Design a protein with these regions (language model features):
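Glycine-rich short-loop/terminal segments
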Residues: 1-17, 120, 127-129
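Caspase-like cysteine protease fold
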Residues: 73-129
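Catalytic cores of nucleophile-dependent amide-cleaving enzymes
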Residues: 6-83
Length: 129
C-alpha cells in the first residue's frame, strides 16, 4: 500500500507522554509504525504538552530518530489555540527551550500570543517550526 504521509493524533498528553483511555501509549508502540512511514512523513501529536521540559525533548528525539520522519507536538496545554508547536527531524536536536510551557501550571486555551500558536482548525505546520 501507499505510505502514510501525515498522521495526526488528537487526544491527551503530558510531558513526554501520549495518553489513550487513561493509559500512556509506550514510545515502542509508536515506533512500530515505522514501516508505514517515509522520511517525508509527518507525525503530528495534537495533544497537550508532549514536547514540554527535558522529558518532552527526549521524547521528541526518540520519536523522530526512531520513526525516521518529522514529529510535531506542543509544549503548552492546547485547546482552541494550540501553542508551543514545534517539529523535530531525525538526527537533530530540539530547537526550543525546555522551560517553554512550564512557567504556568494552567492557562486558558484562548491565548493566541503564546509562542508558535495556531488555531485548532489549521491543518499544516508553518515552515521552520
Amino acid at each position: 500500500g501507499e505510505p502514510v504521509t501525515v498522521l495526526q493524533y488528537w487526544g491527551h498528553g503530558s510531558p513526554g507522554t501520549v495518553w489513550l483511555a487513561g493509559n500512556p501509549i509506550p514510545t515502542a508502540e509508536w515506533l512500530s509504525l515505522k514501516p508505514l512511514l517515509i522520511p517525508e512523513s509527518l507525525v503530528w501529536l495534537r495533544i497537550c504538552s508532549a514536547f514540554q521540559g527535558r522529558v518532552g525533548q527526549v521524547f521528541a528525539k526518540q520519536m523522530a530518530d526512531g520513526l525516521g520522519c518529522t514529529i510535531g507536538a506542543h509544549t503548552y496545554i492546547i485547546g482552541l489555540f494550540q501553542g508551543g508547536l514545534h517539529t523535530m527531524k531525525p538526527n537533530s536536536m530540539p530547537s526550543w527551550d525546555a522551560a517553554e510551557g512550564t512557567e504556568v501550571k494552567w492557562r486558558p486555551d484562548f491565548q493566541p500570543w503564546l509562542p508558535h500558536s495556531i488555531l485548532c482548525l489549521q491543518w499544516w505546520i508553518p515552515k521552520g517550526w
